[in-house]
């Protein structure tokens, strides 16, 4: 198995509050291009992510959308039970729909949230059960993903663990490429 951990900014950190936001189109375009490249090179066959609103769910949605053309499995992992319990109905529905579409879902803890160690254990689980990572993240603009980024960097000191980053410059390039491709198709 060749497993990719996808994580990154939460939706609110990117100012994406709707599935119709044009930024989301560009983000999914960039994620899709990256995943296609790895799949075509035979570097991954699993996309594993968390359930956070934002990059994690978008990464899984993108991988699921590629399953008709590529042999890729998806897994949604959470750091504790009842992960979405405090979310509004709309976000809980998105989470529920995603759990029904992925190939595998589980929690790294057998309990609802109790203490921060559950988050650290989740992070360790993801590092030990994946072979590489993709972060939608820019170290110049830290957010909650900073903790995963730092954990991966530390893990790389003792393990061969490739880390790829889609940063804001990459997203700008993806936006320009997307616009150019759609302009060509329009005319």
Swiss-Prot record:
SUPFAM superfamilies linked: MCP/YpsA-like (SSF102405)
Family matches, as Gene3D superfamilies: 3.40.50.450
Cysteine pairings via disulfide bonds: none
InterPro entries assigned: YspA
Record's signal peptide: none
TM spans (from-to): none
Assigned protein family: Belongs to the UPF0398 family.
PANTHER family reported for this sequence: UPF0398 PROTEIN SPR0331, UPF0398 PROTEIN YPSA
Protein name per UniProt: UPF0398 protein LJ_1195
Lineage: Bacteria, Bacillati, Bacillota, Bacilli, Lactobacillales
């Amino acid at each position: 198995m060749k497993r990719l951990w996808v994580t990154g900014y939460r939706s609110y950190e990117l100012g994406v509050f709707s599935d119709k936001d044009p930024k989301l189109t560009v983000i999914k375009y960039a994620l899709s291009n990256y995943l296609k490249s790895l799949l075509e090179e035979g570097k991954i066959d699993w996309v594993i992510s968390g359930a956070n609103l934002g990059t994690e769910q978008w990464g899984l949605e993108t991988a699921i959308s590629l399953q008709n053309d590529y042999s890729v499995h998806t897994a949604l992992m959470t750091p504790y039970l009842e992960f979405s319990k405090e979310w509004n109905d709309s976000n809980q529905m998105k989470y529920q729909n995603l759990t029904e579409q992925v190939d595998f879902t589980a929690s790294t803890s057998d309990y609802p949230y109790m203490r921060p160690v559950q988050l650290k254990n989740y992070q360790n689980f993801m590092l030990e059960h994946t072979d590489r990572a993709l972060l939608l993240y820019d170290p110049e603009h830290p957010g909650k993903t900073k903790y995963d980024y730092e954990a991966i960097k530390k893990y790389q000191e003792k393990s061969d663990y490739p880390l790829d980053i889609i940063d804001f410059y990459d997203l700008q390039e993806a936006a320009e490429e997307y616009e150019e491709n759609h302009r060509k198709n329009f005319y």
